[in-house]
Amino acid sequence: HIQFIYEDDGTETISLDEAYAIIGNSEKTPTYLQAGKWAVPFGGFDTAMSTDPLTKTLGETAEAALLVGYSKNGFTLEGYGYNGDTQKSGDDDEIDQFGLHGSFETEVSGNSFSIGAGYLSNISDSGTITDNVTGGTALADYVPAWEAHGSLTTGPFVFYGGYMTAKDSFASGELAFNSQGAQPAAWNLEAAYVTEIKNKETTLAVTMQASEEALALSMPETRY
């Protein structure tokens, strides 16, 4: 899988967005291996809105990574490691960041739902935080994070929800909130209704989202 992205920001650049390979045969074994560059499975960002949820803004982490996964009967477990853009001050530039992801999805009486959770050893490697952390990419310490998300589809209605937070605070000199180290978090709730208007599928959706201690990341405190 290879995907390029075109950005018309005045420079009209084309850059590599994703490039990875998956090794496995789901018909014979539930285990698989994925290697390359992509957004690691930290967070559930499905949405019917035209803008990304704040959880994605906070935590989407695209890295060159190696992932080992297991998927069977609706259960998925994944673990991955990567060498992030940020490093502990004084440490060697090596593969020492990692993440875990687990999810379950099923269908009951025509209704489908999914739940998932994840852990990331260093949320500083998310695109938003890396671009805004003060003092470059050398950190006093890694800042782990966790998240939970879910969805429910029943008839024409679809519901999404997610929560993500740093487990610890950043050093105040790296990412601050009210003159102290920030511990950014975000959540989103969304409801969508799928129908037809003039024989065309149409989705009507509403959302409520919020962030905490994310002023330094230029994230809105609330979004509707």
Residue ranges and their predicted role:
Residues 9, 54-56, 63, 90, ...:
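Short, flexible coil/linker segments at or flanking structured domains
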Residues 91-92, 184:
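Interfacial loop-to-helix transition and helix-capping segments at the boundaries
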Residues 23-26, 107-224:
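Outer-membrane beta-barrel pore domains
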Residues 1-86, 94-99, 103-110, 114, ...:
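Outer membrane beta-barrel
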Residues 45-46, 89-90, 171-173:
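A short, polar/proline- and glycine-enriched secondary-structure boundary/capping micro-motif
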